[in-house]
């Protein structure tokens, strides 16, 4: 199958999660929500490094997302990075300095930008590949929610009645 018919939808949903929702309506986030990247920009390295009772941190969530998107980006250029992927590595980087936090956010921003380009580009895919593409959006939404449970400074606006 070809993604031409669903590329605009995939791009809209991923972009909303990463870059924020328009004030006049949204599909996943509340209207006017700033999205993942600007939410992370609100945090200091110290806040991003705060460990949860389970041993993770927002810094680790951000690195995990960066790693997963780097795999998707490599796949989109014809590689098969999944056979040798080591997801556990991204969870080991729980604490960051100020410079490491700036770098981690910049790297995540770059991977999200590359993946948006890939989502916009129609391609022939197998069912398993389409599942991975759609799964990448759900995966990012899950981690955005987890990050927002860890630190309320990252939370978006409450839904207002219309």
Regions found by a protein language model. Name each.
Residues 91-141:
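Acidic/histidine-rich alpha-helical segments that form the ligand environment
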Residues 2-19, 23-33, 37-40, 45-89, ...:
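Short, contiguous alpha-helical
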């Amino acid at each position: 199958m070809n993604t031409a018919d669903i590329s605009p939808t995939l791009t809209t949903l991923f972009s909303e999660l990463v870059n924020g929702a328009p004030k006049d309506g949204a599909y996943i986030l509340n209207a006017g929500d700033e999205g993942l990247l600007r939410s992370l920009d609100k945090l200091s390295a110290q806040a991003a490094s705060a460990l949860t009772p389970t041993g993770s941190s927002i810094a680790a969530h951000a690195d995990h997302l960066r790693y997963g998107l780097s795999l998707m980006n490599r796949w989109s250029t014809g590689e098969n990075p999944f056979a040798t992927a080591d997801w556990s590595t991204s969870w080991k980087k729980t604490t960051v300095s100020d410079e490491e936090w700036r770098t981690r956010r910049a790297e995540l921003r770059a991977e999200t930008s590359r993946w948006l380009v890939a989502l916009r580009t129609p391609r022939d895919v197998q069912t398993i590949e389409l599942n991975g593409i759609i799964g990448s959006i759900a995966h990012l939404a899950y981690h955005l929610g987890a990050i927002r449970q860890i630190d309320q400074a990252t939370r978006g606006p409450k839904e207002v009645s219309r």
